[in-house]
Amino acid sequence: MSSPRDFRAEPVNDYEGNDSEAEDLNFRETLPSSSQENTPRSKVFENKVNSEKVKLSLRNFPHNDYEDVFEEPSESGSDPSMWTARGPFRRDRWSSEDEEAAGPSQALSPLLSDTRKIVSEGELDQLAQIRPLIFNFHEQTAIKDCLKILEEKTAAYDIMQEFMALELKNLPGEFNSGNQPSNREKNRYRDILPYDSTRVPLGKSKDYINASYIRIVNCGEEYFYIATQGPLLSTIDDFWQMVLENNSNVIAMITREIEGGIIKCYHYWPISLKKPLELKHFRVFLENYQILQYFIIRMFQVVEKSTGTSHSVKQLQFTKWPDHGTPASADSFIKYIRYARKSHLTGPMVVHCSAGIGRTGVFLCVDVVFCAIVKNCSFNIMDIVAQMREQRSGMVQTKEQYHFCYDIVLEVLRKLLTLD
């Protein structure tokens, strides 16, 4: 098993929690930009269903059918044990919702009954025990060699040099679709846009959504994803259309709705087992859910109103990524990624954080590496990130996130060598 290539370290704030309040929400200039590291590939398939503007009707939910609580302990300054939300949803805005102050950093979790356990902690522990299909003396030696190379890279700050090389790499690409006046308000950040060559088209008219097809080739196998921003209130309908058109059965959400008092992603799913989320073309039912210590599982049935066709979708929301930086422990994220991989059955896995490049890039990179380890394949973290950046600008957004990719792989390899 061979390894990756170079990098450098110092905490850098990324999109997941650093925006200031906009003063004038009537101008495009109020949309936040990255002020950070930014950056086509295979031909992507086309889909059906025309994209039309759809209306959200969450306001039809009577309050006596549900109660929203924040079950997740805060990882930022304020730490209320529970926050009950009873007010109406705030209207959409011209600029990114990330500009809105919105209270403490919490994951919105419905207080529901009559649910069934979906997975046990024991099963998740088993999934975290990543083991190659072949684990003989030769393979153990290869793993030891790989571990030694990665540890030397970390000690010598080669990882930071790798990241710098990725930042300096010129990746010419066009963002014409995302920059069209009619599409600008669909972007959470004005400089985080999909390449025209890899953007996900909606419907026969190939309408716009801020999402990119990502195809990563490693050891002769292709891994297929959709990397996208967290939905805005105005793009929730488009988001579900994308999920259905691509026949995706897993959504990996790596953000809380609110972090550091800032809205990072709008609540795009139903909040009650009793009432579906009514959209113009789709009806989304919450059928089951499970709140774990570090992520939430939600099971949806999404019905296309015009045909009655129903589509099962599992959403996995990781809730332990801190407002700034990376998780203190890799163990919970390892379990999360492995469970997402086990759950994936159809279509590209849809992965999003807030901007759809930072934490999303970490997820994709580490998922590919874990699959490589299981299949006794070599991997190269720098090459994986380079492939992603050719298809969506700025994937794995910060030096800290890039280093975390190495840290989590090192932890898995070290545990692997302790197995009998």
Swiss-Prot record:
Q: Which UniProt keywords apply?
A: Cytoplasm, Cytoskeleton, Hydrolase, Microtubule, Nucleus, Phosphoprotein, Protein phosphatase
For region Disordered, the annotated ranges are 1-47, 68-108
Keyword Calcium carried by entry: no
Domain of life, per UniProt, equals Eukaryota
| Keyword presence, Magnesium | no
The record describes the protein's role as: Tyrosine-protein phosphatase targeted to sites of actin polymerization in response of varied extracellular stimuli. Has tyrosine phosphatase activity towards various tyrosyl phosphorylated substrates.
Expression by tissue: Present in many cell lines (at protein level). Widely expressed.
Q: What is this protein called?
A: Tyrosine-protein phosphatase non-receptor type 20
Give the UniProt record's GO annotations in the biological process aspect. Answer: lymphangiogenesis
**What Gene Ontology cellular-component terms does the record carry?**
centriolar satellite; cytoplasm; microtubule; nucleoplasm
Q: Which reaction does it catalyse?
A: O-phospho-L-tyrosyl-[protein] + H2O = L-tyrosyl-[protein] + phosphate
Localization in the cell: Nucleus; Cytoplasm; Cytoplasm, Cytoskeleton, Microtubule organizing center, Centrosome
